Amino acid sequence: MEPKKIVPLLRPHPPVVGKVTHHSIELYWDLEKREKRQGPQEQWLRFSIEEEDPKMHNYGVIYTGYATKHVVEGLEPRTLYRFRLKVTSPSGEYEYSPVVSVATTREPISSEHFHRAVNVNDEDLLLRILEGGHVMVDVPNKFGFTALMVAAQKGYTRLVKILISNGTDVNLKNGSGKDSLMLACYAGHLDVVKYLRKHGASWDARDLGGCTALHWAADGGHCPVIDWMIKDGCEVDVVDTGSGWTPLMRVSAVTGSQKVASLLIEAGADVNVRDKDGKTPLMVAVLNNHEQLVQLLLDKGADATVKNEFGKGVLEMARVFDRQNVLSLLEERKKKMPRKSSVH
């Protein structure tokens, strides 16, 4: 039998470029003109794909084997890459192909880009994304917030206007039931609050805890917002459906802000309102050791003699919870109160 004729290794063609994305490039090499593979793998031609390092201008191997296709992954968008094919014969002889240059594509617009534009207050990018029609305007981020919620919370009034003009739903809620109006009220962004109200946001919406926008505004402590809300028709003694607390009760429990309490009381808030457990704002302020608020509530007519549904009054609460300053204040106030004449 005649020995197999050894075909000299010719310089291969550069890899053929297949599918290109923003993070991958497909390369394959044409073997149609070569003899069909026969015998054990060690007698086949071996292929290597090498990628150029643009800084060092040398090449590194990113694939080696007997396949005729390779997908290069983990690439950067809109970046030029240079590759060459190395073909090695069983005898160790090798040849390099000419270099092929390929650029990855632009990264497709996603909801992440959309939310990133809102987060950093990038008006131009937001407009480009919306004009391109690549994303739904109400798509939530990973925390369940729509773009409008984020813009409202951060006080980005221009972005709020852009999003509303592009059809966003002002009454959508996040996972805890808060809408954009509640978030803007809590953060104190009056311009955003006014604009949301103008475009259909409701004072009557409640979160999962039963709180309204005024409850959240009271927590936030921004008096200009609270003042405008009340003038716009907010019910000053609106009760949450969880604890039965009014905004004044929230102040007594959370911040102890005298300014917010004064504003609510001046607007007609009931200083002796009771929650589901029979507690008054004064009792809650005592329990939370808000000394100055206790003083204010007493000055505004809070009744220090009432008991909750368990028969406990503010003096007993102050003693049990060791609220010494508040206790002194209450006892001093009690001394000054006129004694009631006994009725026979």
From Swiss-Prot:
It is found in: Nucleus; Cytoplasm, Cytosol; Cytoplasm, Cytoskeleton, Cilium basal body; Cell projection, Cilium. Polyubiquitinated. Polyubiquitination leads to proteasomal degradation. Residues 11-108 form the Fibronectin type-III domain. GO terms for biological process: negative regulation of apoptotic process; positive regulation of apoptotic process; positive regulation of DNA-binding transcription factor activity; positive regulation of DNA-templated transcription. It holds the Pfam family Ank_2. Gene3D superfamilies: Ankyrin repeat-containing domain (1.25.40.20), Immunoglobulins (2.60.40.10). Its main location: nucleus. ANK repeats lie at residues 109-139, 143-172, 176-205, 209-238, 243-273, 277-306. It comes from the Eukaryota. The fibronectin type-III domain mediates interaction with COPS5 and RYBP. Through the activation of JUN and AP-1-mediated transcription, may regulate apoptosis. Interacts with COPS5; regulates the phosphorylation of JUN and the transcriptional activity of AP-1. Interacts with RYBP; may prevent the ubiquitin-mediated proteasomal degradation of FANK1. This is Fibronectin type 3 and ankyrin repeat domains 1 protein.
